[in-house]
C-alpha cells in the first residue's frame, strides 16, 4: 500500500505498489517525495515469491537463503493520513535482472526481468542512513551462491462453511 492522494487506487484511498524500480523511483509521483527525503527502509523476509513460467503457465516459486536465515530487502517508505489515521507504506526496490544467472528465470518470458535488492547484514545501517545520491552503491545483485528457489504452490483456501 503506498500513500498517494486519497482519490487514487483501492477503494479510492490508496494504491498498491509492492515494487519501485530504481531506474525511475526518483521520477514517479508515487515515490519521488520519499526518494527526495532519502526515506530508505529494510524489509526482513524469510522467503519471497516470484512467478516462474513452465510450459507457458505461471507457477509460484519461493526464493530463500540456502542456510534458511532471514534476509533484508532494500525498500523505500512514506506515510500519509487516510480517514484520520496515519498509514505507513513501503515498496521494495528492484533492479534489472535480464542477464542475472538466477533471477532471470522468473516472470513472463517476454517481460523484463526484475530482482529485489538484498542488503547484506554488514551494510544495513549504512543503507538506512545513506542519502539518495549514495543509494546506487547499495544496488547489489542477488548473490547467486547464497540463494535457491523451489516450487511453492499457494495453499488451497477452504470454502466457507
Question: Which functions belong to the PLM regions below?
Answer:
Residues 1-40, 85:
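Short, His- and charge-rich active-site/binding loops that engage polyanionic ligands
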Residues 5, 64-96:
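A motif-centric signal for short, conserved binding hotspots located
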Residues 28-38, 50-76:
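Extended alpha-helical targeting/anchoring segments
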Residues 39, 59, 69, 88, ...:
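Residues that flank catalytic or metal-binding motifs in active/ligand-binding sites
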Residues 46-47:
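Tight coil/turn sites that cap or link beta-strands
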Residues 50-54, 82-84, 101-102, 158:
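Short acidic/glycine-rich loop or secondary-structure boundary segments that cap or lie
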Residues 93-161:
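C-terminal accessory segment of soluble enzyme catalytic cores
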Amino acid at each position: 500500500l503506498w500513500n498517494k492522494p486519497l482519490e487514487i487506487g483501492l477503494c479510492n484511498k490508496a494504491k498498491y505498489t509492492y515494487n519501485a524500480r530504481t531506474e525511475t523511483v526518483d521520477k514517479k509521483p508515487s515515490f519521488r517525495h520519499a526518494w527526495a527525503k532519502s526515506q530508505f527502509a529494510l524489509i526482513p523476509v524469510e522467503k519471497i515469491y516470484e512467478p516462474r513460467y513452465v510450459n507457458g503457465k505461471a507457477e509460484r516459486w519461493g526464493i530463500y537463503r540456502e542456510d534458511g536465515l532471514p534476509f533484508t530487502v532494500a525498500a523505500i517508505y512514506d506515510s500519509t493520513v487516510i480517514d484520520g489515521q496515519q498509514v505507513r507504506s513501503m515498496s521494495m526496490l528492484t533492479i534489472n535482472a535480464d542477464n542475472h544467472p538466477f533471477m532471470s528465470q522468473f516472470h513472463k518470458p517476454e517481460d523484463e526481468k526484475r530482482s529485489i535488492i538484498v542488503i547484506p547484514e554488514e551494510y544495513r545501517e549504512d543503507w538506512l542512513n545513506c542519502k539518495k545520491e549514495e543509494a546506487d552503491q547499495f544496488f547489489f545483485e542477488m548473490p547467486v551462491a547464497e540463494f535457491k528457489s523451489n516450487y511453492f504452490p499457494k495453499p488451497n483456501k477452504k470454502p466457507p462453511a
